Regions:
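Membrane-proximal alpha-helical anchors
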Residues: 3-70
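An amphipathic alpha-helical interaction surface
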Residues: 68-140
Length: 140
């Protein structure tokens, strides 16, 4: 009788420990995903630092002087690359749904800015096979 009790107790303890281990794995995976998404957001912020305020206020790219124009154009291209990577990662289930929804809102808003539209048109004409995931998202 006593041996059965300890056997039952050991079984219950094993189940509890298995549950706690599973819960820890779930939490670590969530933490890892959050850190990964945060790194993509930080990458976005670094790119955006090269885009002048005038562009965010709907100015055309050609209103900038040559140096700022070139730096901004390069930053917008890097932004397209980041967005394409984000879309690919979402399709691979490496990004959470709620994060992706927020990113999509931002992507669509940025793609509506004249400077972004201009660079996007140039990219699509010169490299139509690039940025396929981003193309699917923005519809052109």
């Amino acid at each position: 009788m006593k041996i059965e009790f300890f056997g039952d107790l050991a079984s219950i303890a094993t189940v509890i420990l298995a549950f706690l281990a599973w819960r820890q794995i779930v939490l670590l995976r969530k933490q890892s995903t959050t850190a990964f998404e945060d790194s993509l957001t930080e990458h976005y912020r670094r790119i955006m630092e090269s885009i002048p305020t005038d562009i965010w206020l709907r100015s055309e790219l050609n209103t900038l002087d040559k140096e700022r124009h070139d730096r901004c154009r390069d930053a917008i291209y890097r932004y397209f690359d980041l967005c394409n990577e984000q879309a690919l990662l979402y399709n691979m289930k490496r990004v959470r749904e709620d994060s992706w929804i927020e990113w999509c809102k931002g992507i669509r808003g940025n793609m509506d800015l004249p400077a972004f539209k201009g660079v996007w048109t140039e990219v699509r004409e010169k490299c139509p096979d690039n940025f396929t995931e981003l193309s699917a998202l923005v519809g052109h």
